[in-house]
Amino acid sequence: MELKFSAEVELTLSREVDPAEIEPTVEEFVKEANEDLLQRGVPTGKEGAKIESYRVLEDTIEMEITGTRYLRPHEAAMRVRKRLAERLGRKHRVGVRDLKIPRYEVVLRFDREVTRDDVGYVPVADDVVVEDGTVRLTFQDVDEEMLRRHVIDRVIRLVAWAVEERSELVERVTKVEPGTVVDESGPREIRFDGDVTEEARRRGWVKEFPGRGQWIYTPPMAALFEVLRDFLLERVTRKLGFEPALFPKLIPLETMFRMRYLHGLPDGMYYVCPPKRDPELFDDFKRELYVWGELNERTLGSLKEKLRDPGYVLAPAQCEPFYELLRDEVVDPERLPIKLYDCSGWTYRWEGGAAKGLERVNEFQRIEHVWIAEPEEAERIREELLEATKRVAEELELEWKVVVSDDPFYLEGRLLEDRDIELPDVPSYEFEVYLPFKGERSSEEAWISVGSFNVHGEHFVDGFNVKEKSGRTLFTGCAGLGVTRWVVGLLAQHGFEPEEWPEPILERIDEKFGGLPEVPKTLTWPE
């Protein structure tokens, strides 16, 4: 990719001057700057920046500056401002009070045809023109904050990523091709091929909640959920030495920003808008609600006016508080690894139209394992969790496979990061079980992930400024066992008759509940 830059620059003087008086000084400076100042730091044989033209006014010096990837016009302008101010101060007792860039243009030339759809939405840019293999970005009134925060550099990186790198993001990090099956149980006898959601609904084990992707789980389903959760905790979590923790499920946006989750999956979360704490402010909403007698555009519009901007999300990953626990801390290697788990509540993801049945919901429960350790041990912990999960699936006589994941949730969030961090060869594995009612084994649609096993490398260590006292590398990891989906997987393969269920489940249901609880029936439900 070839880059070219040009900028209109205005240097505001500290007082009005006679242009003829200072123009010789400016002319001399421009010549010297083009030969030396604007070439410093540029590799031999490459071009830096250049002041193409200038004009001296009574209170302003206007310049047209071009640049390359080695020295961009805004960087050149800041050099010019400092050095020219020093020279004008010595010779004419006038300084440079302000730097403005009314217009900044960036041209990106690619080696292939580029369309406007390839580029996509470009924040901050006032104009985007795409012709053949060229993308021309124009920015108006660039201020110092934009320069200080490297906003234009980030826009360039965003466009380059969108055109050249987006489809390669996972492949660049994952050394094994996503979708590769690394282990599997092999086929098992199919005992049930009915639709789990429809059968559970018919029996009254679940009832659909008004919210999309939400269900009420009645006693038979809840009992099965509890014993499966306890079985996983016993055979996997506690057996491997994970300690309990209670993590908040209302997560500040700042935390999601640090995780780079906002960069990667902003459309997959529920956002929380706290109300303005003023009861009188809500009086007109209550009156609107009373008069209209329903939730409509008018009543909801009145409510929206009383809400603050989004400040939180409902936990979409469940591991978020672990990184806040470690934030800005120094870790003692003698106390590693730190291994915690949380299974204290719901996890929320907005699936939108993809929410379907019990197998893909917006609200679900998991056992979330989190850990921090030195790299080799961090990966070993993941392997131990995977092996323990396989043993559980075997005890439950489930058909399963382990697949290299194609969607480590944090990777896309690194697209604007220039820092080089260490990552494992395979960031993420998915543990999937077969759902016979969804189709043949050869169809990816017939498999559902019941566990995700991730080693993040230094991603969160870097984002949350976690240090090891001797400066050694630390990795974090997380592994979520989706208990709600384990229930679906067991019912999909073994059916709804308890006598067909694996012995470990039956024993625990009898021990804990004295048998499978009954559905709380009414005169009209279940049908």
From Swiss-Prot:
GO molecular function ontology, one term from the record: serine-tRNA ligase activity
Top EC category: ligase
Listed cofactors: Zn(2+)
Residues reported in the UniProt entry to bind Zn(2+): C319, E368, C478
Free-text comment on the cofactor: Binds 1 Zn(2+) ion per subunit. This ion is coordinated with 2 cysteines, 1 glutamate and a water molecule that dissociates from the zinc ion to allow the coordination of the amino group of the serine substrate, which is essential for catalysis.
GO cellular component, one term: cytoplasm
InterPro entries the UniProt entry points to: aa-tRNA-synt_IIb, aa-tRNA-synth_II, aa-tRNA-synth_II/BPL/LPL, Ser-tRNA-ligase_2_arc, SerS_tRNA-bd
Binding-site list for L-serine: A317, R349, R366, I367, E368
CDD domains linked to this entry: Gly_His_Pro_Ser_Thr_tRS_core
Cell location: Cytoplasm
Annotated residues for binding of ATP: R349, W350, E351, R360, V361, R485
Database matches in Gene3D superfamilies: 3.30.70.1920, Bira Bifunctional Protein, Domain 2 (3.30.930.10)
PROSITE patterns: AA_TRNA_LIGASE_II
EC annotation from Swiss-Prot or TrEMBL: 6.1.1.11
Main location: cytoplasm
Keywords assigned: Aminoacyl-tRNA synthetase, ATP-binding, Cytoplasm, Ligase, Metal-binding, Nucleotide-binding, Protein biosynthesis, Zinc
Pathway: Aminoacyl-tRNA biosynthesis; selenocysteinyl-tRNA(Sec) biosynthesis; L-seryl-tRNA(Sec) from L-serine and tRNA(Sec): step 1/1
Reactions catalysed according to its record: tRNA(Ser) + L-serine + ATP = L-seryl-tRNA(Ser) + AMP + diphosphate + H(+); tRNA(Sec) + L-serine + ATP = L-seryl-tRNA(Sec) + AMP + diphosphate + H(+)
Subunit comment: Homodimer.
Free-text note regarding domains: Consists of two distinct domains, a catalytic core and a N-terminal extension that is presumably involved in tRNA binding.
Similarity comment text for this entry: Belongs to the class-II aminoacyl-tRNA synthetase family. Type-2 seryl-tRNA synthetase subfamily.
Task of the protein: Catalyzes the attachment of serine to tRNA(Ser). Is also able to aminoacylate tRNA(Sec) with serine, to form the misacylated tRNA L-seryl-tRNA(Sec), which will be further converted into selenocysteinyl-tRNA(Sec).
Protein name stated in the entry: Type-2 serine--tRNA ligase
Source species of the chain: Methanopyrus kandleri (strain AV19 / DSM 6324 / JCM 9639 / NBRC 100938)
